[in-house]
């Protein structure tokens, strides 16, 4: 939050700022109020800087939620964490260091209110993660001082990891999946795009999408016959069917790390959403995986590619990372810098605003 003021000095004129856990939701809301998305005009051509907020619960923190949508009783914190973490922790000190679990039902209620208040807000960052391990010890608290990367010195974000050693404990995927599905359903209800974090879980994310496949022509015709619909085929393919699908309209696979072959699955016409793929130098070009990222970027359709900094601090470093990834994508795609920048801008506008 301390680096937000550095946005006013950045070359970037629009930032998409995403929540990840309980402490972030209000911070993102405050930032969106400081730099409101313009209304009454095309936001993509606004003359002033603005923030597109995104509200969601990241899989790294999904253990902090308990699913009470079908029950009222709040679980015992220790028993809750033993049931959602693998292996089940026996370390009492570690268990006591974890925050009291938060109601998924309440989180969804509050998130819907925020999404309603901010009509251009996204759902994110959400997703699935097989590899993440919880850090040791208590999380950073408000008032602890941090030197922000590329931004101003200020407080740690409450609840953050901030370089602590990792434990052997992971969040059970059987717990992560209903948390993700619930947020997908909320995004579908309000027709909002979603940013998805997926690490070693692209197949599981795809399975979730596949569980809500677009109906085939035969299925649409059968539905129309059953309901005695006399509208044209075009009408049957339109808003009524779209609204009946419990799925978001657009999904971005954030800092996509999957193989090129998986793109065909995500881009299949049966997937009930327009899938975009974003890339960052911080994630996609920071290791030996760079060669894979190059082959993936070459294979992504020109109108489905996005770029990002994947940095938590506004300021010069964020500008630098954004510039680097624009140059990298243009080089790989063999676009001129000017043409590539315009393509990426159009893609972002289409993803965010539809």
Segments predicted by a language model, with ranges:
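Mid-to-C-terminal alpha-helical segments outside catalytic/metal-binding sites
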Residues: 320-354
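An N-terminally biased module of ancient metal coordination in phosphate/nucleic-acid-related enzymes
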Residues: 1-55, 66, 116-244, 251, ...
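Short acidic/histidine-rich active-site segments
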Residues: 303-319
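Histidine/acidic-residue-rich catalytic or RNA/ligand-binding cores of hydrolases
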Residues: 29, 205-209, 263-267, 289-294, ...
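Glycine-rich anion/phosphate-binding loops
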Residues: 94-110
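Fungal intrinsically disordered, low-complexity polar regions
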Residues: 74-87, 143-155
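Short loop-to-alpha-helix "cap/lid" segments that border enzyme active sites
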Residues: 231, 237-241, 259-269, 286-299
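Glycine-enriched alpha-helix->loop->beta-strand junction motifs that scaffold or abut catalytic
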Residues: 13, 245-250, 267-278, 301-304
